[in-house]
């Protein structure tokens, strides 16, 4: 599947990325093909959610924070007639992504080294912009949203998924926090929960939340649909497939099922949504 040159790029990237982020790719326990196959399955689920959400066929698509390209691969497979761009600040990741795309036979993908805060594209260029668990990692959230709005075409869409830091849980480090937790307090709580050297990872996190993002949407004259409302309301009446991801990783799912069992999940869900008190952000934004 992958040429030897691409495999070497992968292994070089894995060596340096351990010093840059929280991820440990389990490559010591599994081979590279296993890792790629597993990540592709996850990205295919993401692409499916986006295609269900965005009915319009996009011509030009941008994935912000594309890393080594998994979401772009699945999006390009879903939209075969589209041109897909991935932008990623990690130069080594871009090299891996471009080489992997070539080996896998993708003709409609291009990976660019750059930042979400200074997108190297003209105004009104993209029909669809994707920010999948990335906005909490950028240096300047406000500038990144401004740039998305600038390069998005009229009637174009932005798909945003991210943790909600009003919810008292930090998913990257798997620690309990407080609503709207400050970074110093988050570090303190991480140490109490015996997080080791990864505590420093908190320094580059941006504690995004619906209030912050909706203010930026309004500033840029964007319309938005808070898809989390639909997601959790449907779950409260029995459609739990969209929250099944929490099943093995969060007490949220256990509490959800308990409150559902005793018959108070509907009013609790409505109250939680009103207070923006839920685990993850999910927006469809339109220009």
Model-derived segments and spans:
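Conserved alpha-helix/loop element of class I SAM-dependent methyltransferases that forms part
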Residues: 39-57, 74
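Conserved glycine-rich SAM-binding loop
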Residues: 67
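A short glycine-rich, Lys/Arg-flanked "PGG" loop and its adjoining helix->strand segment in the class I
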Residues: 142-157
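A short beta-strand submotif of the Rossmann-like class I SAM-dependent methyltransferase core
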Residues: 131-134
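Conserved class I S-adenosyl-L-methionine
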Residues: 159-187
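Class I SAM-dependent methyltransferase SAM/SAH-binding core
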Residues: 70-78, 82-117
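A short acidic, Gly/Pro-enriched loop at the edge of an enzyme's catalytic core
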Residues: 117-128
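A C-terminal cap/extension of S-adenosyl-L-methionine-dependent methyltransferases
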Residues: 5-32, 193, 205, 211-215, ...
């Amino acid at each position: 599947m992958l040429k030897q040159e691409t495999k070497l790029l992968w292994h070089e990237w894995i060596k340096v990325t351990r010093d840059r982020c929280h991820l440990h790719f389990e490559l010591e326990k599994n081979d590279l093909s296993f890792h790629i196959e597993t990540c592709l399955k996850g990205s295919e689920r993401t692409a499916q959610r986006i295609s269900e959400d965005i009915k319009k066929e996009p011509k030009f698509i941008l994935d912000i924070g594309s890393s080594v390209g998994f979401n772009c691969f699945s999006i390009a497979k879903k939209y075969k007639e589209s041109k897909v761009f991935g932008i990623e600040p990690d130069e080594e990741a871009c090299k891996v992504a471009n080489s992997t795309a070539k080996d896998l036979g993708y003709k409609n993908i291009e990976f660019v080294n750059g930042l979400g805060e200074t997108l190297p594209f003209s105004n009104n260029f993209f029909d669809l912009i994707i920010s999948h668990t990335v906005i909490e990692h950028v240096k300047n959230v406000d500038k990144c949203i401004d740039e998305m709005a600038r390069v998005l075409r009229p009637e174009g869409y932005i798909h945003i998924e991210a943790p909600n830091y009003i919810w008292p849980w930090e998913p990257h480090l798997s620690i309990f926090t407080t609503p709207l937790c400050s970074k110093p307090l988050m570090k303190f709580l991480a140490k109490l929960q015996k997080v080791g050297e990864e505590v420093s990872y908190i320094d580059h996190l941006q504690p995004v939340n619906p209030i912050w993002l909706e203010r930026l949407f309004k500033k840029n004259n964007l319309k938005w649909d808070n898809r989390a409302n639909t997601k959790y309301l449907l779950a409260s009446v029995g459609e739990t497939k969209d929250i099944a991801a929490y099943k093995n990783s969060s007490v949220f799912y256990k509490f959800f099922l308990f409150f559902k069992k005793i018959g108070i999940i509907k009013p609790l869900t409505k109250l939680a949504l009103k207070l923006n008190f839920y685990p993850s952000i999910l927006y469809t934004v339109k220009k």
